[in-house]
Each structure stands twice: as structure tokens, then as C-alpha cells.
Amino acid sequence: MSAFQPTIKRRESTKIYVGNVPIGGDAPIAVQSMTNTRTTDVEATVAQIKSLERVGADIVRVSVPTMDAAEAFKQIKQQVNVPLVADIHFDYRIALKVAEYGVDCLRINPGNIGREDRVRAVVDCAQDKNIPIRIGVNAGSLEKDLQEKYGEPTPEALLESALRHVEILDRLNFDQFKVSVKASDVFLAVESYRLLAKAIKQPLHLGITEAGGARAGAVKSAVGLGMLLAEGIGDTLRISLAADPIEEIKVGFDILKSLRIRSRGINFIACPTCSRQEFDVIGTVNALEQRLEDIITPMDVSIIGCVVNGPGEALISDLGVTGGNKKSGYYLDGERQKERFDNEDIVNQLEAKIRAKVARQDPKNRII
């Protein structure tokens, strides 16, 4: 890794816990996703949650729209280890039911679950059971009076909506909550979060909502969340993609990894290739990404097809390969090794070296 280190001053915030996962304060920025199965299909939902756990999800959100879904949630909760957030709208009784079943966090908007006595019932229950709440404001579901006041979703409108819900919880002396102000427009979301970050001390849940498909959504999320994270704003995040939820976790960690905020697994540094490449760089990277998904120890690996930039990148990598005629140069911890890799077998040889280094460096293969 380069000796140059960015200076990101994290916004000060209070710390809450979603299950055993700390959010805010000096805690690592948590990466989460949401199931897209029918919650009443317990087997499919449990399988998806476990697949998200395997790729590093810190928290998983589950939609609970009905009492039948709440009963299914009880079974789901018993079969998984990762903390679960129940996403609930309108019916306060569902929130009370999942609280009974051990939910780790409630995603509600106090303003849309009815009269104040209902809100108080949910908040009192959350207080008694030490369950945090996420207030989730979305530009697509802004209150009618705010749409009329501002004409359209604006940063000020999203902030006002969020502060309304915050005020309800403040009035009930409840402070274990986090807040999000999501929009599908990058600039609208970013400015809304900036305003909110100045207005409250609670942790912020980041996201660009309905960002799009796997490619466009990942780019949009990286731009928006990257701007905020580089300013020190954000305590947990979800990448919203019209794709397999596993991709949301991978993209989330890739964004944090790119900003050197939190690393998980291999950070591949690879050239885009040209006619100078001495081995199949693209095929090598694709193969290693798939083979090494189980590695969670942070590590920089450079895979460069020729000697133009290869040696320089290898010097600041944990492991590096620089393309050569029939055999390629191998670097370990920035030092050129006598050993060379056969270009026809470079994937197998590099995988073996990476796994050996992980075993030496971090026997528990832990995440940072």
C-alpha cells in the first residue's frame, strides 16, 4: 500500500448498537443489504441471509409488511446469526410483534404509523427491549404538505421531514436511533445528508435509493456515497441495486476499500491491458476474484501485464506480478523475488502465494 494516507475526519456521532454491531462514534462503517425474497418464504429468506453473511454483511434488513410476515420473521431470526432490521410501515402492531421475536432494529417512520399513542407504544417497547430505530426518509415518499411547500423533493424538504420524525422520538425521550435521507438523485441525496449531518448527532445511514442496475447503480452509489464518506459523513451504508443483494455488499466494501476506510479481502490493482501484455490479465483477475472470495484479510495485489507500470505498482503492493516474456516477475511486500511465474500457470501460482501469505499474516483470516 502507498505510504500516502488520506486524512478523513469522521463526523462525531453518538453510538448505538444493532444487535452486537456498533453504529456511529468510532465504530467501523457497517455494510448492510436487504432481502428480496418473500419474507413468508422462510427457507428462501434464510438462505439469502446466510449468503449475505458469507460475503461480509454486517446487518441485513427484512421487509415485514404483514402479520404473517412477522410470524415468518420469528422463524427466520432463530436460524441466522447476523443482526436483522425489520422494515415496517403503517401498522404499529407488526413492530410490537417483531420486537417480541427478537428483532435487532426497527426501520419505521414515526409519522406514518398513526396516532401518538401508537408511536408511544412502539417507542416504549423499543426502549424496554433496547431496540434501536432507523428513521428512513425517502424523496419518493415525501409527505404531501412538504411536496406542496417545496414544489418537489429538495434537500431542505428531506431535512424537514427527517427532523419531524426526530422531534417525535426526542419528545418521547428516545435517543437510540439512526437516520437516513435517501434520494435517487446523487446531488439531492448528498446535499440532504450534509444538512442532516449538521443538524443532529445521531448516526447516519447512507444510501442512494433506487440507484439502478448492477453497473449504473454501483457507479451512482460510488459517486454519491464516496463524496459523503470522504467528508467524514456516514456510519453505515446500503448500496441499493436492482441486482442480487450479494452485489450490494461487494460494492459497499469496494467503496470503503477505495477510500481506505475499511478493507475486506483482496484489493486487485490491474491494468486495463494493451498489446504489451505478456499474459491474460483480464482472465487472471476474473479467475482470482472468484477463487479468492473466501479471503477476508485485507491485501493489495497488483496484476500488471508488462514492465511499464508493473514494477512501480508492485513496489506498493503486498504481492505483485509484472508481465514478462513467457515468465513474469513476482514481488512480495514490495521486493522483487528470484522466483518467476510461468505465464501459462499464473493463476494457480498467484493463488497459492496469496493463500500462503494470508496464512502467515492472519491465521484467523479476519476483517478490519
From Swiss-Prot:
What general EC class does the enzyme of this chain belong to? oxidoreductase
Where [4Fe-4S] cluster binds, per the record, is at 271, 274, 306, 313
A GO BP term, please?
isopentenyl diphosphate biosynthetic process, methylerythritol 4-phosphate pathway
Cofactor: how bound? Binds 1 [4Fe-4S] cluster.
Q: What catalytic activity does the UniProt entry give for this protein? A: (2E)-4-hydroxy-3-methylbut-2-enyl diphosphate + oxidized [flavodoxin] + H2O + 2 H(+) = 2-C-methyl-D-erythritol 2,4-cyclic diphosphate + reduced [flavodoxin]
Q: What is its EC number?
A: 1.17.7.3
Q: Where is the signal peptide?
A: none
* UniProt cofactor(s): [4Fe-4S] cluster
UniProt cross-references to InterPro entries, sorted A to Z? Dihydropteroate_synth-like_sf (IPR011005), IspG_bac (IPR016425), IspG_bac-typ (IPR004588), NO2/SO3_Rdtase_4Fe4S_sf (IPR045854)
Q: Which GO terms describe its molecular function?
A: 4 iron, 4 sulfur cluster binding; 4-hydroxy-3-methylbut-2-en-1-yl diphosphate synthase activity (ferredoxin); 4-hydroxy-3-methylbut-2-enyl-diphosphate synthase activity (flavodoxin); iron ion binding
Instruction: Quote the Pfam families the UniProt record gives.
Output: GcpE
Q: Which UniProt keywords apply?
A: 4Fe-4S, Iron, Iron-sulfur, Isoprene biosynthesis, Metal-binding, Oxidoreductase
Q: Pathway listed for it?
A: Isoprenoid biosynthesis; isopentenyl diphosphate biosynthesis via DXP pathway; isopentenyl diphosphate from 1-deoxy-D-xylulose 5-phosphate: step 5/6
- Report the protein's function: Converts 2C-methyl-D-erythritol 2,4-cyclodiphosphate (ME-2,4cPP) into 1-hydroxy-2-methyl-2-(E)-butenyl 4-diphosphate.
The text of the family note is: Belongs to the IspG family.
Protein name, entry field: 4-hydroxy-3-methylbut-2-en-1-yl diphosphate synthase (flavodoxin)
> To which species is this protein native?
Haemophilus influenzae (strain 86-028NP)
